């Protein structure tokens, strides 16, 4: 049963209530000249996205969006409010979101002196919003559920290889569905991954350069299959100041991929017992120089 935390702020406008859901995926916030003019929340119920009502009025300043990762949830909302000339009561002037994993949004709106925080005393999960709105947002409250088994934030294992190129980081997801590896004459030229997030396919960016050799694909039997380790090698290649990744091999709970690339140089393995790989990061130029992973504990 969700706990309804009373709305605070002013008494203007009309009451609105999105109710309680399983979680929050996105919050769209619109700013006016005097404060927060608009809010619209995308919730999740099971694997379905539910778009809440549009509360307040959009302005020419536009809309900003705070997105919550699939393995994270909002635990607190800091709200500022003030009495502004032209309004009969206090209005909401800014909103700042904080999550379980320590992610904090910028303040959306104009940060003023009067503050309150919407949260559950045991660090519960925010699952809905309610409040008052007219031409602007007057009051804001929330629904929380007590989380008896908090989500574990993903752990980032350091990348290995040579310190050259531009850093990239796909972040952490629910799992990995497909791996694409592009090979060059001297090493791995490019990588790209298809992830799962909330039962949706998320196609990651392509990191590196295409070659005439094209991409090779390694597909997992997701969700029953997951990557448990990545083996590889890196070596110093003529034409590059530091080492390049010249081979990658992916191990799952069911099988092992063929080696992609040429096995030579220093060997490495990226893994942690009892964990699955849910994201990748590294450094790249014309070839892949570094490769690292994000991991989460395996749960039944």
Swiss-Prot record:
Organism domain of life: Eukaryota
Domain Jacalin-type lectin, chain residue ranges per copy: 2-146, 154-297
Modified sites of kind N-acetylalanine: 2
PROSITE patterns reported for this sequence: JACALIN_LECTIN
InterPro entries in UniProt: Jacalin-like_lectin_dom (IPR001229), Jacalin-like_lectin_dom_plant (IPR033734), Jacalin-like_lectin_dom_sf (IPR036404)
Parts of the chain that traverse the membrane: none
SMART domains: Jacalin (SM00915)
GO BP field: embryo development ending in seed dormancy
Keyword Cytoplasm: no
Knockout-associated phenotype: Defects in female gametophyte development. Arrested during endosperm development.
Pfam families xrefs: Jacalin
One Gene Ontology term of the molecular function aspect: carbohydrate binding
Entry keyword annotation includes Repeat: yes
Keyword entries, A-Z: Acetylation, Developmental protein, Lectin, Repeat
PANTHER family named in the record: JACALIN-RELATED LECTIN 11-RELATED, JACALIN-RELATED LECTIN 3
Family label: Belongs to the jacalin lectin family.
Function: Involved in gametophytic development.
Name of the protein in its database record: Jacalin-related lectin 32
Originating species: Arabidopsis thaliana (Mouse-ear cress)
Gene transcribed to yield this protein: JAL32
């Amino acid at each position: 049963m969700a706990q309804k935390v009373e709305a605070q702020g002013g008494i203007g406008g009309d009451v609105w209530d999105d109710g309680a859901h399983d979680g929050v995926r996105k919050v769209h916030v619109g700013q006016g000249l005097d404060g927060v003019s608009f809010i619209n929340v995308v919730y999740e119920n099971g694997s379905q996205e539910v778009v809440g009502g549009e509360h307040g009025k959009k302005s020419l300043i536009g809309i900003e969006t705070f997105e919550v990762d699939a393995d994270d949830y909002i635990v607190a909302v800091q709200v500022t409010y003030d009495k502004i000339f032209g309004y009969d009561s206090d209005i909401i002037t800014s909103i700042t979101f904080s999550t379980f994993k320590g992610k904090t949004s910028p303040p959306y709106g104009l940060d003023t002196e009067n503050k309150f925080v919407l949260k559950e005393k045991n660090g519960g999960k925010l699952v809905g919003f309610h409040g008052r709105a007219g031409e602007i947002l007057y009051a804001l409250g929330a629904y929380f559920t007590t989380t008896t088994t908090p989500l574990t934030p993903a752990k980032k294992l350091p990348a290995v290889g040579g310190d050259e190129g531009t850093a990239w980081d796909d972040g952490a997801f629910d799992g990995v569905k497909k791996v694409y590896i592009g090979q060059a004459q001297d090493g791995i030229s490019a990588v790209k991954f298809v992830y799962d997030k909330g039962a949706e396919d998320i196609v990651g960016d392509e990191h590196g350069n295409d070659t005439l050799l094209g991409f090779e694909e390694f597909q997992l039997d997701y969700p029953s299959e997951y990557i448990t380790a990545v083996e590889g090698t890196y070596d110093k290649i003529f034409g590059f100041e530091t080492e390049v990744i010249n081979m990658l091999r992916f191990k799952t709970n069911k099988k092992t991929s063929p080696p992609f690339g040429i096995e030579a140089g220093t060997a490495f393995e990226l893994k942690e017992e009892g964990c699955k790989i849910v994201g990748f990061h590294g450094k790249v130029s014309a070839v892949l120089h570094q490769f690292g992973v994000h991991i989460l504990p395996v749960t039944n």
